[in-house]
Amino acid sequence: MKKKKAAPHSRFNTARKISIFWTLFIGIGAVGGAVTMLVDPSGGLMGMDAMLPYFKKLPFADVLFTDFVFSGIALLIVNGITNLIAAALLFAKKKSGAVCSMIFGITLMLWICIQFYMFPFNFMSTSFFIFGFLQAATGYAAVIFYNQEHFVINEENYKNIGSDPTRLVVFFS
């Protein structure tokens, strides 16, 4: 009986699966939060109505932040739909999904930096800043691992390999 040769372990697939978790976790959460903000712009449904005065620190607060409609739309676009698109690309095993995961992790950290400016210290903002960092880090790792696993050496491009024993040729992946 012949044994099947095991497929080599793919670090890209491991990082890709972790990135899928982060993009779905953040994307679905953002869509849920955005829908709730759009259904109840006062913020009462999520217990956020007391947070609205903190938005007065932002530019155009008297126009954009009288309720949570603009915040809901921004959350849906910036953190919701984008992360779900990244998850779809990661499911398709595309390198662009890993790049998007990294970028959207950084975007989440920037989003949370605005919250650090607006709100007093709180567990939720700090947690999501860490989640953004972890998403960016796993996205970056997936990009690196993808590049390493798809690195190709074509010796025909290096015609003089072995012709001069005094010359050292080094390949980098």
Positions of PLM-derived features:
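Topology signature of small-to-medium multi-pass alpha-helical membrane proteins
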Residues: K2-S173
